Amino acid sequence: MKKLLVCFLLCISSASIAANWIPSKYPGVYIGKVTNQGIWIKFTYPEPTYIKGGAGKVSHFIAKVKSDCKNDLLNIVQNTYYQEDGSVVRISDYPIGFAEMTPDSIGESILKAVCSYKSSKK
């Protein structure tokens, strides 16, 4: 079981390095793979930082998100937090659903970046 978990984490880590991330006009936010189930985004912190429940400093995270741009709502489905060396710090799933984002937050920047990207592809 431990070997399977290690293989899974290595696959996620290598996927974060191999993805083609498109920079958005919002600092630190990059757009990745777009699917019918959501959009993968990457957020890079200006400086590595500690997160609650993490086991080290985080340099960036990758999240699968769904957006409701018409109503300014974002659903963060899953987050994977990484250290600078690419090792996984924490994986979180969020069964909450769509929510308003706090003004001037990372979530609001992600929502704006995703909605801007989606409107440019219409």
Show which residues each predicted segment covers.
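N-terminal secretory-pathway/extracellular module detecting exported/lumenal segments
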Residues: 17-122
